[in-house]
Amino acid sequence: MALEKSLVLLPLFVLMLLVLGWVQPSLGKESRAKKFQRQHMDSDSSPSSNSTYCNQMMRRRNMTQGRCKPVNTFVHEPLVDVQNVCFQEKVTCKNGQANCYKSNSSMHITDCRLTNGSRYPNCAYRTSPKERHIIVACEGSPYVPVHFDASVEDST
């Protein structure tokens, strides 16, 4: 009797392990929208002329693990304002795709660029606070930013 129960439960147990094996990796995978937020959003602070801002933020946001990300931009505006860019002026992305949008107004940003001679694991960045229009690629449902394409000066 106990052996029969074991034989019935064993295939169910194996099936459960297989399902968990397929589901678990997808649970831990960061969506493109979440990655955009991690890499580019810093709504809680204003542009900083503090020379260590980029060094701290690039480390804190995991962009110096395994390599030094050469360039990154942080946006210091409310997330909803950046998400609204997806419904503003449509422009062509740098890679030729047609899903990029330019903000109607300039936004507070901080550009971070790897300094010359900086090598992993000692990633050092130059911090440049700016006010620029941003260009983001958008996708999904809801339609949200998934890639920071560029920043451009006001053309007026």
From Swiss-Prot:
Keywords: Disulfide bond, Endonuclease, Glycoprotein, Hydrolase, Lyase, Nuclease, Secreted, Signal. Its EC number is 4.6.1.18. GO terms for biological process: defense response to Gram-positive bacterium. Substrate binds at K35, R38, K69, P70, V71, N72, T73, K94, R113. It is an enzyme of class 4 (lyase). PROSITE patterns: RNASE_PANCREATIC. The keyword Lyase applies. The keyword Signal applies. One of its GO terms (cellular component) is extracellular region. It is found in: Secreted. SUPFAM superfamilies: RNase A-like. Monomer. Interacts with and forms tight 1:1 complexes with RNH1. Dimerization of two such complexes may occur. Interaction with RNH1 inhibits this protein. Belongs to the pancreatic ribonuclease family. This is Ribonuclease pancreatic. It comes from Nomascus leucogenys. The lineage of its organism: Eukaryota, Metazoa, Chordata, Craniata, Vertebrata. The gene is RNASE1.
